[in-house]
Amino acid sequence: MKPVPTYVQDKDESTLMFSVCSLVRDQAKYDRLLESFERFGFTPDKAEFLAADNREGNQFHGFSWHKQMLPRCKGRYVIFCHEDVELVDRGYDDLVAAIEALEEADPKWLVAGVAGSPWRPLNHSVTAQALHISDVFGNDRRRGNVPCRVESLDECFLLMRRLKPVLNSYDMQGFHYYGADLCLQAEFLGGRAYAIDFHLHHYGRAIADENFHRLRQEMAQKYRRWFPGRILHCVTGRVALGGGWYEAR
């Protein structure tokens, strides 16, 4: 039988606007997320919901789960978010408007989020932040100016185009710094990362455990060969990448 090819066009023909992907351990927290997204306009004709299932144990980690989810996504834009976020006063129309404004301002954007650190800040004595979020540190918090270009993003809410994906490193694993890694990979691809103004509530609490410090060291060791001397600002603190190729092991 003669093969029947599919002719692919250079355009996004998806009828869905969003694929909302979540890394899920706690079903109750995820149910709260689902209810809030539905309440704020992410209806079945506009969005699909996919869950990386860690309810029975960690079969996915931060650097791996995006890769598993992307091939299954059908939306024009893919959201990667924690299970413990909740929409509180911004919804579907607000996010679409924020994306459209970003598209017009900088077509080279590849990754966006709601909390990050401004790109290449001049002052390294304090950690630079750009965000609008409610979290364990306070309600309706604002730091810096959003939208703005950033060099790292918090993992609680990440966004990219399905047809312009950015993947995390294959040589790292864990649940910390994969947002920063994603932004640095976007730089390698010739793109940029942005923090946008899309207020939501993140109930999570960052834990600086042994794995946090291990990944911090691995990030510095990995990226110093390409960015020698750079001080990378993240919402959880600064990472001094160190020297050049002679320090890479």
Curated annotation (Swiss-Prot):
Q: Which residues form the signal peptide?
A: none
Q: Source organism's superkingdom?
A: Bacteria
Q: List the disulfide bonds.
A: none
Q: Which Gene3D superfamilies match?
A: Spore Coat Polysaccharide Biosynthesis Protein SpsA, Chain A
Q: What is this protein called?
A: ATP synthase subunits region ORF 6
Look up and give the organism this protein is from: Fuscovulum blasticum
